[in-house]
Amino acid sequence: MQVQKSFKDKKTSGTLYLVPTPIGNLQDMTFRAVATLKEVDFICAEDTRNTGLLLKHFDIATKQISFHEHNAYEKIPDLIDLLISGRSLAQVSDAGMPSISDPGHDLVKAAIDSDITVVALPGASAGITALIASGLAPQPHVFYGFLPRKAGQQKAFFEDKHHYPETQMFYESPYRIKDTLTNMLACYGDRQVVLVRELTKLFEEYQRGSISEILSYLEETSLKGECLLIVAGAQVDSEVELTADVDLVSLVQKEIQAGAKPNQAIKTIAKAYQVNRQELYQQFHDL
């Protein structure tokens, strides 16, 4: 067991600060974040060029150390040595909270293992910011980060998560969003979803509706900018009622036309609408 008293313990080692940065609007930078970045000895940045612009805007002269997913393994021992020697470090990502979809978690774990104080500053977070304005249930919720890119892996992911009652959040590229929603529709059914893009920026947009409605909208509207997808959790009662008005056999046939094998198509639709797979099999084959 380990007990950390962030501001009371007198240690010879430095402190690792996790500093959030704006996700699009520089006015979201906090006074404490600016002060911390000025006071630490080094800033560990995911992209030194991107962070350099932020530092210049706020007149911060602290030296940067490049720290990203491609060099984290080799850099972490050196960073821990700096902390043990008494230097304080701030870790930042390109936007938002460190450790969320970046290598910060590994650095935090290494610091804790070395009994180094880790202090997180509150601030901008894309997932929570979008969630509270989405209109979907804010709790319970689960954030998955970036989805698998390959269609097969993505479908398997959705099939595994379709019955979860929590509101689900994902990052996705605007170039893949239609394919992702199509895969989600096949596995989750036509749930409520909110597609958020350009969060905190001039062209911030929330698209709220069912998955099929969002897909129809995207057929007529181009999509640009960073996207965050929020999906309602499974509601058994409503999904059972929905199946009474849905031609499940036709949905199975559509899956087959899209390239799925009959048994896999039956399994996918049975999971999406929470019906007995054997009964759907018999219905499809008219047994």
From Swiss-Prot:
Gene3D superfamilies membership? Cobalt-precorrin-4 Transmethylase, Domain 1 (3.40.1010.10), Methyltransferase, Cobalt-precorrin-4 Transmethylase, Domain 2 (3.30.950.10)
- Signal peptide positions are none
| Localisation | Cytoplasm
Q: Which GO terms describe its cellular component?
A: cytoplasm
Instruction: Identify the Pfam families for this entry.
Output: TP_methylase
Report the transmembrane regions from the record.
none
Family, similarity comment: Belongs to the methyltransferase superfamily. RsmI family.
Identification of the protein by name: Ribosomal RNA small subunit methyltransferase I
